Amino acid sequence: LKLIALRSVGFNHIDTDYCKEHNIAVVNSPGYGNITVAEFALALLLNVARKVTESYTDYKNGCVKPENLIGTELCGKTVGIVGLGAIGSAFAKIAHGLSMNILGFDKYEKEELKQNYGVKYTDFDTLLKESDFISIHAPLTKDNYHMFDEESFKKMKKTAIIVNTGRGELIDTKALYDAIVNKQIAGAGLDVLEKEETITDFDYIVGLNRLDKFTLEQTIINSQLFRLDNVIVTPHTAFNSREAIQRILQTTMSNINEFSSGNIQNNVIKI
């Protein structure tokens, strides 16, 4: 094995230490889904904020009560963006177009976002306390695992909505569930979950008795999230547009061709 060509940006599922040790190149597909994922994050946010799924379900069941379907507007509200890389930046530009106030949390500040799109960089605690909505676009690292934990949710507004299209492990799912049930926050739109593979993977489902304690607990919590009216969960599909898939294919083939020619592009580890 000489090359692992990923059809994704993230590579946290790859044993990079093993690849370094065995001189295996790992290349990813950056940039294919910047606007695609950002648009989907907005869709999740609007869905929860304006109670779209709840409205559809109630209407379908013939039990519409307008007083139960009162939503909240995005215009003029404050959105906190955690991670202002390519996707987070695309989301910031969309939010600016909706006349939202934008707080950003990232160790690298982009002058373009500050000057042209009104992004105000701040610390994590301030973002938690002042945001009406939070959209997560950070990559998963060993340092930000469960960055949204019980204490984080306690600092957020009771009317806040959180959206995650990054990685499920950025949120402590049990803490999120408790925060929503206890009305510490207003709702969530999630395209990623911890242990999300247990939801649809048949091998996991039929082997529940063989799961480790943590995975079993996450599977149970995930199933409970689906029962909450103010939560929408989608199957890690934010990237999934015709245009993004075409860009993935083009980048993957280019990566393979370049490697075959003695060049490495989009390399994620140094061998």
Briefly describe each language-model feature range.
Residues 38-57, 77, 93-100, 179, ...:
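Oxidoreductase and adenylate-handling cofactor-binding alpha/beta cores
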Residues 1-3, 14-26, 136, 140-182:
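Beta-strand-loop-alpha-helix segment that lines the small-molecule cofactor/substrate pocket
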Residues 1-56, 68-71, 75, 162:
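Phosphate/diphosphate ligand-binding glycine-rich loop within oxidoreductases
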Residues 3-5, 25-27, 103, 122, ...:
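Structural detector of well-ordered beta-strand residues that form the stable sheet scaffold
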Residues 67-158, 174:
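Rossmann-like dinucleotide/phosphate-binding beta-alpha-beta segment
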Residues 9, 132, 138-140, 166-167, ...:
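Short glycine-/small-residue-rich Rossmann-like dinucleotide-binding loops
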